[in-house]
């Protein structure tokens, strides 16, 4: 599943091709992805793209009459192509531009979404969510205060979008390993110093992943079709049974909150 770094990489990749371009047409080859594609998106035809933003794992393509809100789901990707490039089997949405390009949305599993938000309004999917992890609002003190009285495993806690957005499964495992914190620990058991360390590693891990173009494990590719290279930086994720890069002990795998979790039981405590 594309996580925050992959969505941010997509935003950075499409922005130079979309910004200040006019949307000539919107083509939908399916009526429904995760949700029904709203007819209001057709309002964006003929409008100039003013800004391409991101909130959590949602891309926001803004015009004067409203915004398209795009979620990549489990297997979605966005590519910028020449407008006459033929569509493939899983190419469900085309946004044709005045510069002769098309923003094409591909999603084999159809778990993604294209939604509409009126000017100045937030869609319901963006309500009641936590701060962005790469902003100053997300710091050790904030997490320490939020953690008080919480017995849930720390890995589940940092993946809760109501606490902080965009810390997905891959980056949660990697950040906890780099912080030397066991993912099964009760959230309330972490000290203020441990929270500061974990927050620092979450920020570093996400930023490095963005700089590396994200993590390509299966479906994700950048806007130009290239893979992300952060997979080469992974230290524990997907490496059960392999030697820990720090101590040589076998990396463990365990289900936490129904998600595969990878850690070193010797290095992390």
UniProtKB/Swiss-Prot annotation:
EC nos: 3.2.2.23, 4.2.99.18
GO molecular function terms attached to this record: 8-oxo-7,8-dihydroguanine DNA N-glycosylase activity; class I DNA-(apurinic or apyrimidinic site) endonuclease activity; damaged DNA binding; zinc ion binding
Keywords linked to the UniProt accession: DNA damage, DNA repair, DNA-binding, Glycosidase, Hydrolase, Lyase, Metal-binding, Multifunctional enzyme, Zinc, Zinc-finger
GO biological process: base-excision repair
Catalysed reaction, written as an equation: Hydrolysis of DNA containing ring-opened 7-methylguanine residues, releasing 2,6-diamino-4-hydroxy-5-(N-methyl)formamidopyrimidine; 2'-deoxyribonucleotide-(2'-deoxyribose 5'-phosphate)-2'-deoxyribonucleotide-DNA = a 3'-end 2'-deoxyribonucleotide-(2,3-dehydro-2,3-deoxyribose 5'-phosphate)-DNA + a 5'-end 5'-phospho-2'-deoxyribonucleoside-DNA + H(+)
Binding site for DNA: 90, 109, 150
Zinc fingers, FPG-type class: 235-269
InterPro entries: DNA_glyclase/AP_lyase_DNA-bd, DNA_glyclase_Znf_dom_DNA_BS, Formamido-pyr_DNA_Glyclase, FPG_cat, MutM-like_N-ter, Ribosomal_uS13-like_H2TH, Znf_DNA_glyclase/AP_lyase, Znf_FPG/IleRS
Keyword Lyase: yes
Domain of life, per lineage: Bacteria
CDD domains: EcFpg-like_N (cd08966)
SMART domains documented for this protein: Fapy_DNA_glyco (SM00898), H2TH (SM01232)
Cofactor(s) annotated in UniProt: Zn(2+)
Note accompanying the cofactor annotation: Binds 1 zinc ion per subunit.
One Pfam family here: H2TH
Keyword Cell division: no
Active-site residues, Swiss-Prot/TrEMBL: 2 (schiff-base intermediate with dna), 3 (proton donor), 57 (proton donor), 259 (proton donor)
Function, in words: Involved in base excision repair of DNA damaged by oxidation or by mutagenic agents. Acts as a DNA glycosylase that recognizes and removes damaged bases. Has a preference for oxidized purines, such as 7,8-dihydro-8-oxoguanine (8-oxoG). Has AP (apurinic/apyrimidinic) lyase activity and introduces nicks in the DNA strand. Cleaves the DNA backbone by beta-delta elimination to generate a single-strand break at the site of the removed base with both 3'- and 5'-phosphates.
Complex and partners: Monomer.
Family: Belongs to the FPG family.
Protein name (Swiss-Prot/TrEMBL): Formamidopyrimidine-DNA glycosylase
Naturally occurring in which organism (per UniProt): Vibrio vulnificus (strain CMCP6)
The gene coding this protein: mutM
